[in-house]
Each structure stands twice: as C-alpha cells, then as structure tokens.
Amino acid sequence: MQDLSFEARLAELESRLAFQEITIEELNVTVTAHEMEMAKLRDHLRLLTEKLKASQPSNIASQAEETPPPHY
C-alpha cells in the first residue's frame, strides 16, 4: 500500500514537472518575442526622434543670443 502511494506521488510530481517545463518554454518564447519587439520599437523611436529634431529647429535661443534680464 505504501508503494502505491509512493508511486502515485512520484507520477504526480513527474507530471507536474513536465507541465512546468512546457510552461517555462512557452514563457521563454513569449519573453524573447517581446524583447525583439521592444528592440524594434526602440529603433523606431530613435529614428522618429532624430527626424523630429532635424525637421524642427529649436525656438530657444542660445545663452549667448539671449538678452540679459533688466536688473543687470
């Protein structure tokens, strides 16, 4: 009787381990896909930022071009 309980427990643990391995592999695939998508989005964001900076000159004058405040 003790052996059946031990065998049943062992089979249950092996089953759980198999399901955990499958779940870990699925999560790994998902994380890898998300990392690749994030890398693409970072590249797009960098390109858009560069285009925006190139297309719009800054409206803020440099400190050398600024007139001093009236209390000087």
Swiss-Prot record:
Compositional bias of kind Polar residues: 55-65
Region spans: Disordered: 52-72
Intrachain S-S bonds: none
InterPro entries: SlyX
Pfam families assigned to the protein according to its UniProt record, in alphabetical order: SlyX
Record-stated family: Belongs to the SlyX family.
HAMAP family on file: SlyX
NCBIfam families: PRK02793.1
Identification of the protein by name: Protein SlyX
Organism field: Escherichia coli O17:K52:H18 (strain UMN026 / ExPEC)
Gene name of this polypeptide: slyX
